[in-house]
Structures are given as C-alpha cells and as structure tokens.
Amino acid sequence: MASNWDILLIQAARQGNLARVQALLSQGANVNATDGQNTTALIYAVQGGHREIVAILREFGADINKSKQPQGLSPLMLAAALNHSEILAQLIAAGANVNQVNQDGTPALMIATYKGYTAIAEQLLTAGARVNMRDRDGDTALSVAISQNYAAIVGLLLDSGVDEEIRQEAWLEALNANRPEILQLFINRGMPLDAPTLSGETPLILAVERGNLGSVQTLLQAGANPNISTEEGETALMLAAAEGYFDIVRLLLAQGASVDNQNQAGETALHLGTIEGHLEIVQALLQAGAFVNHRNHFGDTPLLIATVQGYEAIVLELLKQGAEPNLTQQGETPLTLALQRQFTKICRYLLDYGANPNAVYPDGKTVLMKACEGNNSQLVRWLIDIGADVNKLDFSGASPLMWASYHGCLDTVKVLLDGGKVNLNQKNQGGMTALMLAKFNHHQAIVSLLQQAGAIE
C-alpha cells in the first residue's frame, strides 16, 4: 500500500511540480508506488510531457517498464501514443523495452503507427522495434498503417525488414482498401503486378471486382496486363462491364484491353454489359469496336439478350450499331421474343431496323398471328404497314383474322379489315372461317363487323 509520501509524489508528478517531486524523493517516497488507478509517478510524468520529472524519476530508480494495469500500458507506449519524442528518447536511452506489449498484444510501434506518428515509428525502429510483431488479432504495424492510409509509415515499414508473408498480406489489404499511393510503394519495391495475391486473384482482377478505380489506374500505369483473366476466363473488362463500372471500362479500353475476349461460356464484355442493362458501357464497348453479333455458347447475341430483358435503349443502340435483327436462337428471333413479352416499343425498333415481319414461331404461327391473338392492334398495324402477310396460314390452316376473331380481339379485327387485303372467307383445316369462329365463341361485335365487310359462312 502506498504511504502518504508516495501519494504526494504521484500527485506532484501528475501536476508537473518538479521541486516537489525532488523533495519527496529525497525524503524517501517510493518511486515505483502506484495510486488507486494503478498508475505510477513515471506514467503520470510521461502523460503530462514533463521531461525533467521523467529524468529525475529515472535517477531515483523508477522502473521504466512498469505498466499500468489492467491495460498493460507502459511508459514507452504512452510516450509513443502521445507523440512525446523527447521523452521516448529518454526512455529508450534508459533501456526501456521497445517490444513490450499491452494486454491486447500491441507494442509501441503499432500504437505509433495507428496514430500516424512517422517520426515516433522511426525512433522505435531505430531502437530495435520488431516490425513483424502481431497483436492478438493478428494485426501488424504494416496492416495498421494501411488501414489508416499512412503512406509514409508504410514506406518506412517496408524498408525495415518486413517478412514476405506479412508483405503479401499487406499487399492484399492495400488492394482491398483501394490505397493507390500505398500500392505504388509496393510496386516501387518490386511487387509482381500479375502474380496471384493470397486471395488467388491477380491484383488487377481484385481491384476491378471492388470497383477501385484509383487502384486500377495505378496498376495499369505500372504495366499490369489489361487482358489478364480469372480461371473462368473472365477478363478485367468483362468484370467491369458486368458490374457497371463505366470509368474502369473506359480506362481498360484506353490501356489496350481486348474488347472481344470470351469467357468459358463464350460471353464477351458486350454480352455481360448487356445482361446487366448498362447502357453507357454497351455504348463504350461498341465505340471500341465490339462485335455486335457475337454468339455465346448458348447461341445468344447481345440483341437477343437485351430483347428478352426488355432493355429498350440498349436494343436501339445495338441495332444502330449493326445488330442483325433476324438471327435465330432455338427458332426464336428477337422480334418473336419481344412480342411474347409484349415489349411493343422493342418490336417497333426491330421492325424499323429490318426485322422480318413474317417471322414464324416454332409452332407455325407468324408474328402477325401472335400480335392478333394478343389484341396488340398497334403492332398489327405496324406489321401490316411494312409488309406482313395478312393471309399467311399456320400449320392448322388458320389466318391472322381467324385468330383475332376466335379470341374476340375486336380492335385487331378492325385493323385487319381496314387493310383491305384480308381473305374474309378463308377456311382452316377444320373448315371454319373467321366468321364461324367468332360466332362459335359468341363474339357478336366481331360477327357484325365481319358480316358488314362481306364475310359469309
């Protein structure tokens, strides 16, 4: 237990009262006594930045490694944390343990690093601080410096004997954290640009996946291969296109990334940008010369994909850049797919750019028939205007008029009749006319309309 003299000594050190400290020490106060906070006079003197008091306490035998419990904070750690470089030098000169750790396993070097005190870190390293120490969480001074983005300290640590495992861990952390300036420090010290990181991915792929533009730029400027790919054949450009990282796409293209490389599924960056609906990226890839009609291993072109997804603006852009509107996939064309999904505007774009208005579905029905069945009178009119055959028959011998009449599509029947070329009395293989089908299904308005136009049974 501390005596009254001891308590007075601790108080004097805390207050920075040099004369009082000297007097109490001369009277026999215990230099290593602690108060109710488990704190010594030396720790209070360090905390207050009282250099002269630190010096006199040392002369009277203060234990320079005695730490405050339960935190385990030593005078040296406290000096580092408070950026007291002169006191730190005093303690080091007196033989303080520069590698002593607190209850978390943290040494003074990591504390100084966390605070961003480059000069303090350098003092500690010069005094023998071990650069490769880990705390209880496995962190090192280098990982702390990267997490805090202290480039100057990172450079200092890299030049102080960091072992290869820690260097590789830190490289990966800098990539994940998007630290371009710090990445450059590694690169300047010979870190391979295209070798896999500890994650198994190459630096450029990793940076692109995370959308870290600054890191991507640093890597490319340093000479990273812009066409490097994953095991699945995904290039950096494909990944950026799929994720919608427009600026990264532009940067990769400017640095020579191949626009038509394919992954294991035969997809290009244009396929992937289209799938995700990234119009600006699709435009950038097309401007860079991407092959607009490339098929993946499933037979899909970007136009087929955009059509199925209902991406109107992308469909139009692809068509403007030469996408073929009549390429088929399992018997389907972009137009048949658009009509199935009732994407009327896309149907119009496709027709305007040369889609076959007489395209036939696998079931034998024409696009016009499908439009009639769905009572899409606007599309029916467009199809007729550009030459769709209004009298073409399907496998059952049914015409567009029959299908419209059968389903009760009054508006569509009107459009067909307005065209003036419809065979009113055509019979299907069952011997039924459009009029008979309308009567059978009790569509009286259509029956009247057909009869007025001259239809007979």
Residue ranges, per PLM feature:
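N-terminal segments that cap or nucleate solenoid repeat domains
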Residues: 1-40, 44, 181-195
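Ankyrin repeat structural motif
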Residues: 17-25, 50-58, 84-92, 117-125, ...
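Start-of-repeat signature of ankyrin repeats
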Residues: 5, 38, 71-72, 105, ...
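Solenoidal tandem-repeat scaffolds enriched in leucines and small polar residues
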Residues: 127-153, 159-164, 168-177, 201, ...
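Ankyrin repeat A-helix N-terminal signature
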Residues: 11-16, 44-50, 78-84, 111-117, ...
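Ankyrin-repeat-protein effector appendages
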Residues: 1-11, 155-177, 181-192, 198-199, ...
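Ankyrin repeat boundary/linker residues
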Residues: 35, 68-69, 102, 135, ...
